[in-house]
């Protein structure tokens, strides 16, 4: 072998291998100390890019989970607030139910209305003060609010919370048809009751017979109320236009085909003869008589069949000729505030004919606090005895008074020129259905004694409230009002339940989304760990390998350097 001292090939090889081993040992120590397989781009450039992307995705998903939990917190806050509002509505409906019986006086009903007003104030207070991070939740401004729930932009869930103030909920539709003055067979159809389909009811006969009339029609409508959302009530009443005055019925006087005969009665039916005679056959006629608080004769059909008066009931009863055949008025209620669309055949016999006066109104919960104006009151069926019909056209007041059936014709004791006190006869009278029609009904001409500028005071002042529908007191202070508030409170409850149901659906959607992205986040982190994190078992083996090689490399270099000493032996 050759001996060279200028170039120690063995030492160079040992050094080169030692450098490689030292570098690998450093990498292994770095991995073991950091727990990461990739500590720099040089370790695995593509792996690092993938791992960084996965790390970003996992972090974004973590924030998306937080966003979803914030959204759930917002919706839960609104839901709990509405739960309290629902309890308030339950109390309002309970108080309205308490007021909906004639054992209550105006005083006690007014007390109940005061309670209801306070409850509504608290309901509105909840609606106006419920907030999250300064954001109003129940005021109607929380509309299409977005929550980012994904790793990429525009992966959102939208949430809307409807307004819950008393002015925004409880919107209930009331419709009352015109007074029905003719019998017939009615076929009633609700158009687009569910937004698409029509609902056709069975035909009903409107007459004075048992099992017919508006009572039968209302029963037919109410059988399907759960499906159509429309409920019906009826009022079949014939009321005198003035307090009863002494008079005598004819021998042929009959109601619904049952002859009652001649009855002599006193002012205000003081002897009870007229009421007693009519009620003696009420089980057969279905018509019950009474004298109301104003002293007027009131005939009521409890079961909803018509009231038909034959013969002469006497001028003192003040039953007009056009009221002697009366089949009442039908009232419809719908708990969503939308118009009730009706079609069918012979609708005039149900009060919903093309030429009949139909009162319509949509009323919110807040509106039930205040005074019901005339239009709303009539739509709800207030005082519906003689409304919805015009008495007829006459050239003058005198002409009307002289007409048969007016109660003021010759022989009644109130005829023209008798000098009787007409204002007494017309006190609290209802003459027409709408004040705007006054000029077409009473065309007062010069010379009648009641023309413009007249100073006569025998006739009661012609106020619109005397001749048409009138405003009604607030809320539950009347029986009809209490019934209406019950309907409105029920609608308000349905409205809040719908809003809560929508919120609940969004909460469930958010929860499912959170569950999904939580699993996704775990899987993404697992994938990142597989790429980025070190396998300690494998790396420990590598460390042992390079540690031993480093030690053996040092020994090899030591031996390679010692080989050069052999050259000195040649020189000795």
From Swiss-Prot:
<dbReference type="InterPro" id="IPR042187">
    <property type="entry name" value="Flagellin_C_sub2"/>
</dbReference>
<dbReference type="Pfam" id="PF00669">
    <property type="entry name" value="Flagellin_N"/>
</dbReference>
<dbReference type="Pfam" id="PF00700">
    <property type="entry name" value="Flagellin_C"/>
</dbReference>
<comment type="function">
    <text>Flagellin is the subunit protein which polymerizes to form the filaments of bacterial flagella.</text>
</comment>
<dbReference type="InterPro" id="IPR001029">
    <property type="entry name" value="Flagellin_N"/>
</dbReference>
<protein>
    <recommendedName>
        <fullName>Flagellin B</fullName>
    </recommendedName>
</protein>
<keyword id="KW-0964">Secreted</keyword>
<dbReference type="Pfam" id="PF07196">
    <property type="entry name" value="Flagellin_IN"/>
</dbReference>
<dbReference type="InterPro" id="IPR001492">
    <property type="entry name" value="Flagellin"/>
</dbReference>
<keyword id="KW-0975">Bacterial flagellum</keyword>
<dbReference type="GO" id="GO:0005576">
    <property type="term" value="C:extracellular region"/>
</dbReference>
<comment type="similarity">
    <text>Belongs to the bacterial flagellin family.</text>
</comment>
<dbReference type="InterPro" id="IPR010810">
    <property type="entry name" value="Flagellin_hook_IN_motif"/>
</dbReference>
<dbReference type="InterPro" id="IPR046358">
    <property type="entry name" value="Flagellin_C"/>
</dbReference>
<dbReference type="GO" id="GO:0005198">
    <property type="term" value="F:structural molecule activity"/>
</dbReference>
<dbReference type="GO" id="GO:0009288">
    <property type="term" value="C:bacterial-type flagellum"/>
</dbReference>
<comment type="subunit">
    <text>Heteromer of flaA and flaB.</text>
</comment>
């Amino acid at each position: 072998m050759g001996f060279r001292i200028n170039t120690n090939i063995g030492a160079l090889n040992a050094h080169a291998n030692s450098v490689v081993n030292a570098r690998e040992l450093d990498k292994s120590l770095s991995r073991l100390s950091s727990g990461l397989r990739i500590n720099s781009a040089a370790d695995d450039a593509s792996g690092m890019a993938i791992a960084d992307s996965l790390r970003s995705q996992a972090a974004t998903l973590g924030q998306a989970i937080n966003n979803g939990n914030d959204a759930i917190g917002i919706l839960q806050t609104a839901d709990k607030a509405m739960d309290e509002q629902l309890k308030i509505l339950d109390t309002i409906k309970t108080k309205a139910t308490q007021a909906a019986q004639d054992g209550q006086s105006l005083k006690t009903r007014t007390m109940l209305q005061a309670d209801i007003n306070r409850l509504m104030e608290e309901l509105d207070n909840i609606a106006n003060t419920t907030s999250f991070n300064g954001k109003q939740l129940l005021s109607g401004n929380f509309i299409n609010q977005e929550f980012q729930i994904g790793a990429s932009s525009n992966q959102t869930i939208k949430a809307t919370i409807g307004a819950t103030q008393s002015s925004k909920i409880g919107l209930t539709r009331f419709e009352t048809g015109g007074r029905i003055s003719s019998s017939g067979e009615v076929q009633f159809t609700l158009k687009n009751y569910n937004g698409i389909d029509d609902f056709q009811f069975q035909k009903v006969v409107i007459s004075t017979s048992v099992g017919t009339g508006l009572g039968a029609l209302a029963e037919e409508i109410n059988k399907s109320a759960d499906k159509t959302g429309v409920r019906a009530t009826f009022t079949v009443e014939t009321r005198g236009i003035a307090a009863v005055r002494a008079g005598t019925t004819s021998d042929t006087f009959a109601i619904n085909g049952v002859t009652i005969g001649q009855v002599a009665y006193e002012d205000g039916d003081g002897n009870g003869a007229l009421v007693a005679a009519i009620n003696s056959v009420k089980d057969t006629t279905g018509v019950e008589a009474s004298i109301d608080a104003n002293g007027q004769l009131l005939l009521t059909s409890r079961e909803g069949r018509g009231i038909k008066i034959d013969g002469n009931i006497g001028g003192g009863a003040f039953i007009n000729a056009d009221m002697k055949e009366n089949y009442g008025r039908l009232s419809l209620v719908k708990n969503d505030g939308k118009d009730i669309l009706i079609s069918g055949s012979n609708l005039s016999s149900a009060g919903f004919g093309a030429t009949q006066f139909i009162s319509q109104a949509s009323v919110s919960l807040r509106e039930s606090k205040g005074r019901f104006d005339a239009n709303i009151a009539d739509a709800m069926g207030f005082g519906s005895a003689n409304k919805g019909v015009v008495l007829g056209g006459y050239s003058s007041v005198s002409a009307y008074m002289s007409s048969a059936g007016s109660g003021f014709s010759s022989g009644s004791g109130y005829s023209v020129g008798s000098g009787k006190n007409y204002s007494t006869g017309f006190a609290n009278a209802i003459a027409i259905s709408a004040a705007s029609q006054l000029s077409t009904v009473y065309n007062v001409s010069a010379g009648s004694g009641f023309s413009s500028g007249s100073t006569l005071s025998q006739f009661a002042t012609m106020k619109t409230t005397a001749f048409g529908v009138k405003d009604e007191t607030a809320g539950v202070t009347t029986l009809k009002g209490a019934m209406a508030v019950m309907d409105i409170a029920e609608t308000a409850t349905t409205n809040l339940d719908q809003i809560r149901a929508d919120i609940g659906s969004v909460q469930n959607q958010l929860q499912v989304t959170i569950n999904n992205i939580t699993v996704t986040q775990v899987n993404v982190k697992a994938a990142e760990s597989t790429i980025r994190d070190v396998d300690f078992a494998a790396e420990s083996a590598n460390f042992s390998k390079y540690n031993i090689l480093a030690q053996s490399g040092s020994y090899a270099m030591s031996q390679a350097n010692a080989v050069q000493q052999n050259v000195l032996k040649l020189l000795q």
